[in-house]
Amino acid sequence: MQRGFNEVLSSLLFPCILLITLFFLSDSALSKDQGGQKKSIAENNTNTQNQTSPNSQQEPVKLKTITIEATEISAEPIQKLESRELRVHTGETLGKTLEREMGVSNLSYGPGVGQPVIRGMSGPRVRIMQNGIGAHDLSALSPDLAVAFETMLADSITVLRGPATLRYGGNAIGGMVDIKHQRIPEKIPLNGAAGRMDFRYDHNSSDKSGMIGLDIGRGNFAIHIDYFQRSSNNTRIPGAALDEAAIRQQFQVDPETNSSKVIQNSNANSQGGSAGLSMIGKHGHLGGSYHEMTRNYGIPPGVPGHTDGTRTSQEAIRIDMSQRRYDLDGLLKTYWPSLPKIKAKLSYIDYDHRDYDKGITDRSSSLTQFKNSVWESRLEMNHQRGSWLDGVFGMQWQNRNFSATGIETFTPSTNTDSLGFFLTETLFITDRLNLEVGARIEHQTTNPKSNEVRMAGISAPLPLPNTLNYLTYSLAASLNYEILPQTSLYLNWQHAQRAPDVQELFASGPHFATRSFELGRLNLNAEQTNHYELGLRFAGKHASFLANGYYKSIQDFIYLENQGFFFNFAPDPPRFQQTCANLRNCLPVFGYQANHANFWGYEAEITAHPRLSSPFSPRLTLFSDYVRGWFQNGALGDVPRLPPLRFGGEVGFQWMQWRGGLR
């Protein structure tokens, strides 16, 4: 396996080395080409100066800012937050930042988590990326784990659904979120330096946060540095923290503890920073960066999950995470019209977090550590054929080492390799009609690092396979027609496949942060999704409109199902049983299942923003979105954990540089 790993790594490093070589050769050739012109340019400058009065000076002229607005003809459901809109909506988590976007919800397992949910999909079906490379935290593993990124550092956040997601792998089957930042500078700052500061305060939880970023450039080099810090107290609420009636319904007993007016253990703090260096030329850039962050947050107490005689009555699970990230990024603009641009990325991410219970006196003995070390690289080559064809061919490779050690080792250590190739093409049939098509093939190999796993409550070890292989493919097509100026109608179709993640295959133990005992399935097949979508968009000078409807059918949809019994820690040895006599000793058992599921939903938004002659500009928005999922087997009912129907309105205004709103 190590030999195969080295071979794949070498083959993928070659494109990066090639890109670096071409970068230097291109700039070198450009310098030689410009060298012969320097003399004539200097002579022209001298002649110009001779025609100018010796006492005259060149004064800088300040030009009036001109804003150009245009609507791109595309069939992709894409949303982008940037500049002022991003600053206004930035929240303490990624899910909180994006929850106002159509079709996006916030999966909050407490204020410190906040994962994005796209059209009801989350976890391993939504790929979170930073500058086109996976975030590679463990947020896809469990809903109690936060995305390892501070939203204040983002320059833009893009949410993408539909056919274009096939460029990013099976884990983007439900959608993709790409966080852009200038950690690796792509241009020299104007006047040699630029910076940004952002300080925020939230009254409810006394959330105090701030960041500072600085870009400095000279000649062909630019550097970037930034730092952030965030701290919050427990969240205040108007009533009780726990729904005692719901606990009685599931466990048939009364809860032991509850809190009023505040959610206990919901405080959090985080800090981190990054530095990047880039060499920038007329034909692209080449740079690298380092980023590090730490985050400590609590999971609000619910039903107590376990006892060992040393814990207190008030459960307080906390998560202490850290991540170190190394990125290389290169862009080459070539001389060839048919191959105008080549991009290459290589990243290494080292992530770990520890779950611990503040109620245990000996904290060190209760620590459970999760580690996720990932190499990922991408190579993309843009190609064109005149004005009628534009496309991208690329490859993506990833190697992941995952491990969990401690009393909460509910998933064994594994190594996962994946290699994918993709091709997307846009055919401009007429000025008003275009067709986008794409295809991807990907091979994933998952290797447990042990041939067996021992599970609490079962005396005999469970055997594990040496290797699990999945070959998946995706196909997509999108048609976009501009029926009227600024108005387009689009139709999307996609067939996508996703290989099961490690926790879906190998889970076999307690997970105290989610108050559950999880069981995986080794015989899971790859998910297969067929997605259909019809939408209408209008973007005018004083108003905009978006409406779409979609339907998707997913074969072998993987989900966690309550098994109807409990895992009891009190007996020696622990055992599975049908009822729970003491909440402190029990965990409900959830098992991964696969069944055929169907989804349908819609998104609609209309905005009026008349531009008046005065500095005052009003804005009115009406919106609604909805998703429903159900299993084809009627006895199973609806798909669990879907966001509810949402509708509402927003009234806003802008006066000069001030803006406000009510939603």
Task: Write out the residue ranges for each language-model feature.
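Surface-exposed extracellular loop regions of Gram-negative outer-membrane beta-barrel proteins
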Residues: G134, T294, P301-G305, N401, ...
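Flexible loop and strand-edge segments within Gram-negative outer membrane beta-barrel domains
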Residues: Q264-S270, G284-K341, I349-S373, I407-N415, ...
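Short acidic/polar hinge/loop motifs at secondary-structure boundaries
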Residues: G134-P163
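N-terminal periplasmic "start-of-domain" segments of outer-membrane beta-barrel proteins
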Residues: E59-T97, Q115, G123
